[in-house]
Amino acid sequence: MPILQVELLKGRTVEQKREMVRKVTDAITGTLNCPKEAVRIVIREMEFENFAKAGVLKVDTK
């Protein structure tokens, strides 16, 4: 049973997440030859103040 963890910054719509999990599930089932029902996806959303790149918080880079 494949279990995928996806970490995203907050701000995606439910529709975008639906499309993402559908496409990721299709990619996994096609690659690993397993049924859709076996695929699990966990989406974790981060606040901008909890993510940094090059020493700068995302909240400070608008």
Please name every model-derived segment.
Residues 2-62:
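A domain-level signal for the structural core that forms small-molecule/cofactor-binding pockets
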